[in-house]
Amino acid sequence: MGIHVISICAILAIIPLYWLPVLPDLQTVWMLIAAGIALSLRQKKWLTFSGLAVLFLCWGFLAAQESVWPMNHLTKGPQQAEVVITATDGATMHQGKIVSLNGERVWANMGVALYGNYLPQNVCVGQRWAMTLRLRAVHGELNDGGYDSQKNAFARHQTLSGRFTHAAIVDERCSLRSQYLTSLQNTLSAYQWGPLILGLGMGERLSVSREIKDLMRETGTMHLMAISGLHIALAASAVWLLARGIQFFLPGRWIIWQMPLLAGLLFAAFYAWLTGLQPPALRTVIALVVLAALKMSGRQWSPWQVWLTCVAAILIFDPLAVLSQSLALSAFAVAALIFWYQWLPLPSWQRSRGLRPLATLVYLQVGMLLLLLPLQVLIFHGFSVSSLVANLFAVPLVTFISVPLILLGMFLHLFPVAALESIVWLTADKSLAGLFWLLMRLPNGWQDVDERWQYLTLLPWLLIIGWRFRAFSAVPAVCLAGSVVLAFPLWHRDKTDSWSLHMLDVGQGLAMVIERHGKAILYDTGLAWPGGDSAQQLIIPWLRWHHLSPEGVILSHEHLDHAGGLASLKTAWPAMWIRSPLAWAGHLPCFRGQRWQWQGLTFTAHWPPENTAAKGNNRSCVVKIDDGEQSVLLTGDIEAQAELGMLSHRWRQLASTLIQVPHHGSNTSSSTPLLQRVEGQVSLASMARYNAWRFPSKKVVRLYRTEGYQWLDTPQSGQISVTFSHHSRHIRRLREHYLPRWYHQWFGAPVDNG
């Protein structure tokens, strides 16, 4: 049985972990293992392959069960644990690995994020602490097309977070890597591009400024920042060359051809450890081990066989890597390169000696730009049109000048040669200064792409395949029909009588989108925090991905969990109108009795009165949206006192099909008279699962259900979308209906709040 066949079995068996809605229980897994062993011992090849695939699938199930176990068993009360610090900001944010529980050794990879507390003495990576922990399971916001933090946590084996109530040092020694990194940081603090040198050499990107990261994203050069195959392969190649050079002076009987290969491999592993064994670096080492083993086998392997074996080895080593975006990008990029050069090789007329390096580099970048489009658009919702030009000088400069200098500087830092080391660091600093001087002269090349184009991004692949098989002349009708199908989302139009309400999952805040005829307005804009807000992180990307430009915003009130993203939205769409009860400059009024039309929908403000003395929550702008048959009542953070005041004025007009739960489901809102007068059928609530106020109140949830409402909230469902059409409505809950994955479940305590 060929190794490539085993690799295919492993890949096809583990990939379903990405889509499975639930994990089988352990009893089922053991039954499957027995069946897999029985099948793999059969004589017929297809039965043997099936048995191997079942065994690899069970290996993935066991890895997933191992990652889920801590969340369901360690979040029920205080835990006595020993934790090894793996990362820290030196203050209140720490990452660690649990190595023992209640005095017993833990072999599973249990990562934990600790926050909010200072440790009783100076902390550094590598220290071992005895702690009393209060842990909780990972739970992330989930929006259509948004960043999936919960999936990423599983891929990083970081599924627990929490606080420590007691901590005592067990071993205060810092790791060798931590000592080396601290020394290196002190040395590089004198250089302008020191943070970037640390990022390129050690993978420490926290100190790289946001402006630099944005510039690299806009120019398509962000991939150069990761400690990946480029850096580690360069380091391994340098050691391989050094070992070959040493062999030149040795007697022939002492020369073993495998030694340079093994030396390079060992140094690659050492360098990956030095950079913190980040997932991309660890995967590169695994791939290099596979490559070395294949090389020493004495057989000739095709590029596709090598690719399959490397990917399979990575997934067997860590089945949850199938959830990793970085692995998907790396594997897809290598596959695209193989495909590009095999199916569309560089024309021979371009291979003149003088033009060959430039032609090869341009050809490489064109291939990467075209063939990586499907994954770029799917993950990042766009691509950089300036990446072709930027990478033409950035890749050679970083690969052949900056990174070798940084590696040399890191090596010299181990020895007392300060003068020589400073020359190397200065040269590396100047090379990066030159690189970013050039990058800053390029126009902002980032191009947002909405979801309608994601199928058309497959065209470069399909055109190359069609050209090689002469499909355009053999079956032109099929090619034309295929293009029409790929472009279907561009010319398809939804029913004209429908409209949608989207409650975005923004955590402890509120942001709702009203959509009709390809237009949108927002009710509230999410929350803000130091250095960012919901609009930058979530709302603006969501709107652009869904091809929506907001025409206006209804702002319920001024609190930061509702108005936090307003400035960012206004920057993105300056012509957007704002309606609020705040009487701020440029705001249209939103007071009781006002009425307006938008896209055939009627908006009526029911609170506050124009001359109210109320402030904060009780001045929330309450708006009813009506299409003539069904309606929605948006209530902001209105509390019981204001609810009763609103009911005293034309309460019959408040009847609605759906209500947005006031004040995130707090005890101070959602009075019984309001729920009875609204007479609704569905209630939508927005909050974070782990919020400081323990919303929603159990009493409030029970009240809604008693009054006949269907209760839906963002922690349980993620983004909630309701589509209204003639005499009907359709509710889509992202976590349960559209992305029902085992890693999206509610882990830990069944109910956290109340």
Label each residue range with its predicted role.
Residues 1-72, 76-82, 243-255, 259, ...:
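Transmembrane helix-bundle segments that form internal channels/tunnels in multi-pass membrane proteins
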Residues 266-273, 289-296, 312-320, 373-377, ...:
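Alpha-helical transmembrane segments of multipass membrane proteins
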Residues 56-223, 533, 537-541, 545-549, ...:
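Membrane-interface helix/helix-cap signal primarily in integral membrane proteins
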Residues 118-132, 158, 351-354, 410-754:
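Non-globular, low-confidence helical/coil segments that flank catalytic cores
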